């Protein structure tokens, strides 16, 4: 079914179309000049799609799939306000000659959070009050600048240290040209973080927590007492997460994603779960567009061990290199402790160990070997997998880097991203265990066209991440168990896989279902097309989500959907009705009843008479159905009343009668327990059985409009009301004039008349 175009004209009777709102154009049918006054463009739904260009990919996952033109206008207004927030605030503060105090993150114990040791022992001071020579940067950012404070956020420190060495990553998070003194200084600092699918700017004031009576920063700080960018960055991240306390004991993977926009994969190193080809994977990751970190599980926070390593502590994995050692290849891992001090590995290949004497000077030069107490050290692959618990790998994609930027000499990975919401009774079908509802879950098709260039097995590495909105730290809610299934896509697939198709297919890959912010899994598959189905574990759980797919080679993506079409009652339903009429002979009887009650002047009946007729027929023989009421009968009249007379003639009635019997037949099929209701999850299948195929956006509107909010079910009355209104809508659109593109053209008056008479 084509689109609808409403065109306003001076006399409200002339229809026309233009691609440019606000211009005078000539109506191709009348030759008259008309003026178009639309506020929302034809392609407004394109804002739901990611923008892929030379810059970082732009995407707003908070826009609902059900976006309307009114919603679009509100969204544009909000975006304009948000984009000017920083400039507007700075301008106001300069006019008022005041320093900003952030009302959303006040300088008090609320910002500190649940850290009892610091309650009422903190003062808040601005950088110039802590050090009169305070600067945002002192000689530029470096991974050796940063020191951890009293907060257990070494995981954040490790990632900040890692990205500080790469301007293409660091400058996105820490905007340049920020000063802590001078005519432009107003006490406002800004940072950017990637959050649930897009980059957000976080504004903070520059008041920082210091120990009472001393000018020493409590939390993250620079080893240069005049430099404050790292302390302010930590504060902005604390604001994003609710308070400083929420930064204690996090994971590197979360910080990696929030500071790069990449997607993280966790690799367990214990012997049972360790991949058999781990060293090959690490070699490839070291050569790809990736950041890597690692950690050691320990029951004691930051436990210092005899071998120089620290338990429950995050490290950066900065390199994987082979060296020739005693005639064989020895793989070495280069790591860095974010504390940047002498707490380093003390075993084989540590700084100054005898093993290095047997390595050629050229090889030492090739790997930039140096021995200083800077927290950076080397160890063998064998010791690494024995001592460490996991590796976290962050793959950088279209949201992480601009088109002309690279990382380790490698281009960013290709990326596809989808956003959605699991909605109760619509598409929150749960996992495959829920056989009657699983098929309603969102479906996305991806196509990977070429195998990986850095191996020879003719397969593609595909990394899939499913993320749910992070409300845990904001409102204390728990994450829901989420996961996804991957299926081979039929060659001709352009619409949703049906319930029957899904229940007879086996997934080629699947993730675990875990109650974490994000679930990721990596697969190696031949080039081709695949269907990814994300879901919660249980049905009827409402959560916003984004689904991301990364690959070294190009990806094409499509949200699977149906076109809005009316194909009429299927042949099997028509045949069933013929058989039924042979047995009951009701068609002739109902025709005689119509003739008996018609108005002799018009040979037609109104909605009241229609109700009397239908309530004395077999159509009303449905459990718990209270009969054809006035509202339902009015809509039934409207569905066949082509000239808006408010009456139904005999031929119109008989057409409606046949269709109504077909709709009743379909309702009974889905009302398996003969209760007079069926589940809202079955509505789409019932519509398909009636010949109506509707899009994801339309089924959402239908279910929200016609389900019983108390039972989450569809009654016979609401089902019939939906059927007749869909009939009216489809036939109105099909009958209306169209342009060369198949878009239906409505004047404002026509649209309003059909909207109210339905």
Swiss-Prot record:
Gene Ontology CC annotations of this record: cytoplasm
GO biological process: proteolysis
Name listed for the protein in its UniProt record: Calpain
Activity regulation info: Activated by free cytoplasmic calcium.
The keyword Protease appears for this protein: yes
CDD domains given in the database record: Calpain_III, CysPc, EFh_PEF_Group_II_CAPN_like
Annotated binding of Ca(2+) 1, by residue: 641, 643, 645, 647, 652
Family: Belongs to the peptidase C2 family.
Record domain Calpain catalytic: where: 99-397
Transmembrane segments: none
PANTHER family linked to this entry: CALPAIN (PTHR10183), CALPAIN-A-RELATED (PTHR10183:SF433)
Organism domain of life: Eukaryota
Pfam families: Calpain_III, Peptidase_C2
Active site: 154, 313, 337
UniProt keyword annotation of Hydrolase present: yes
Top EC class, one word: hydrolase
Positions bound to Ca(2+) 2: 671, 673, 675, 677, 682
Chain coiled-coil ranges: none
Gene Ontology MF: a single term: calcium-dependent cysteine-type endopeptidase activity
Segments forming domain EF-hand: 658-693, 694-729
Region of interest called Linker, as start-end residue ranges on this chain: 563-582
Additional note from the record: This protein binds calcium.
InterPro entries: C2_III, Calpain_cysteine_protease, Calpain_domain_III, Calpain_III, Calpain_III_sf, EF-hand-dom_pair, EF_hand_dom, Papain-like_cys_pep_sf
Region annotated Domain III, chain positions: 398-562
Region span, Domain IV: 583-757
EC number: 3.4.22.-
């Amino acid at each position: 079914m084509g689109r609808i175009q409403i065109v306003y004209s001076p006399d409200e009777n002339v229809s026309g179309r233009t691609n440019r709102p606000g211009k005078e154009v000539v109506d191709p049918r009348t030759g008259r000049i008309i003026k178009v006054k639309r506020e929302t463009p034809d392609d407004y739904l394109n804002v739901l799609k990611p923008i892929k260009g030379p810059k970082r990919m732009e995407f707003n996952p908070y826009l609902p799939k059900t976006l309307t033109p009114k919603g679009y206008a509100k969204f544009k207004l909000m975006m304009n306000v948000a984009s000017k927030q920083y400039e507007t605030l700075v301008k106001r503060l300069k006019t008022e000659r005041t320093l900003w105090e952030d009302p959303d993150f006040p300088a008090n114990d609320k910002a500190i959070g649940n850290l009892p040791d610091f309650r009422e022992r903190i003062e808040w001071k601005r950088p110039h009050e802590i050090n009169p020579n305070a600067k945002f940067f002192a000689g530029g950012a470096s991974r050796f600048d940063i020191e951890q404070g009293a907060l257990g956020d070494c995981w954040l420190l490790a990632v900040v240290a890692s990205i500080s060495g790469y301007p293409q990553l660091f400058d996105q998070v820490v905007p340049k040209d920020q000063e802590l003194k001078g005519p432009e200084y107003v006490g406002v600092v800004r940072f950017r973080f990637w959050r649930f699918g897009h980059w957000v700017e976080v504004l903070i004031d520059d008041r920082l927590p210091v120990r009472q009576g001393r000018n020493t920063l409590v939390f993250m700080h620079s080893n240069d007492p005049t430099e404050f960018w790292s302390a302010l960055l930590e504060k902005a991240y604390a604001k994003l997460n609710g308070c400083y306390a929420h930064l204690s004991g996090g994971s590197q993977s979360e910080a990696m994603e929030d500071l790069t926009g990449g997607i993280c994969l966790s690799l367990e190193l214990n012997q049972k779960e360790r991949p058999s080809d781990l060293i090959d994977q690490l070699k490839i990751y070291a050569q790809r567009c990736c950041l890597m970190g690692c950690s050691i599980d320990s029951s004691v926070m930051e436990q210092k061990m005899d071998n120089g390593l620290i338990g429950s502590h995050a490290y950066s994995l900065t390199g994987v290199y082979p060296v020739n050692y005693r005639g064989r290849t020895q793989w070495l891992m280069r790591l860095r402790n974010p504390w940047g001090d002498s707490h380093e590995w003390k075993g084989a290949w540590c700084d100054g160990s005898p093993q290095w004497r047997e390595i050629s000077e050229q090889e030492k030069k090739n790997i930039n070997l140096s021995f200083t107490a800077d927290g950076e050290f080397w160890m063998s692959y064998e010791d690494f997998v024995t001592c460490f618990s996991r590796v976290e790998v962050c793959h950088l994609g279209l949201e992480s880097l601009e088109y002309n930027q690279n990382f380790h000499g490698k281009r960013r990975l290709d990326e596809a991203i989808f956003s959605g919401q699991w909605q109760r009774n619509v598409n929150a079908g749960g996992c495959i265990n829920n056989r009657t509802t699983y098929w309603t879950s969102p479906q996305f098709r991806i196509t990977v066209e070429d195998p990986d260039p850095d191996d020879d097995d003719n397969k593609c590495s595909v990394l899939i991440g499913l993320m749910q909105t992070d409300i845990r730290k904001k409102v204390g809610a728990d994450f829901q168990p989420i996961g996804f299934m991957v299926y081979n896509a039929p060659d001709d697939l352009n619409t949703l896989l049906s319930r029957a198709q899904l229940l007879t297919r086996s997934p080629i890959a699947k993730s675990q279902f875990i109650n974490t912010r994000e679930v990721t899994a990596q697969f190696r598959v031949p080039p081709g097309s695949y269907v990814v189905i994300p879901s919660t574990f249980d049905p009827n759980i409402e959560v916003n989500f984004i689904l991301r797919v990364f690959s070294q080679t190009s990806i094409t993506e499509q949200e699977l959907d149906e076109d809005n079409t009316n194909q009429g009652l299927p042949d099997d339903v028509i045949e069933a009705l013929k058989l039924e009429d042979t047995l009951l002979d009701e068609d002739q009887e109902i025709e005689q009843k119509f003739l008996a009650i018609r108005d002799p002047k018009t040979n037609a009946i109104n909605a009241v008479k229609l109700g009397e007729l239908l309530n004395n027929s077999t159509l009303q023989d449905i459990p718990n159905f209270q009969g054809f009421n006035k509202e339902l009968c009015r809509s039934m009249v409207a569905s066949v009343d082509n000239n808006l007379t408010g009456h139904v003639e005999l031929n119109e009635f008989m057409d409606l009668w046949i269709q109504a019997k077909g709709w009743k037949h379909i309702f009974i099929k889905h009302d398996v327990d003969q209760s007079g209701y069926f589940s809202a999850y079955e509505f789409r299948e019932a519509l398909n059985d009636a010949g109506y195929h509707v899009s994801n956006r339309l089924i959402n509107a239908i279910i929200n409009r016609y389900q019983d909010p108390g039972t989450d079910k569809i009654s016979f009355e609401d089902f019939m009301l939906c059927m007749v209104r869909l009939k009216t809508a489809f036939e109105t659109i099909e009958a209306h004039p169209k342009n060369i593109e198949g878009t239906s053209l409505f004047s404002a008056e026509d649209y309003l008349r059909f909207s109210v008479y339905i």
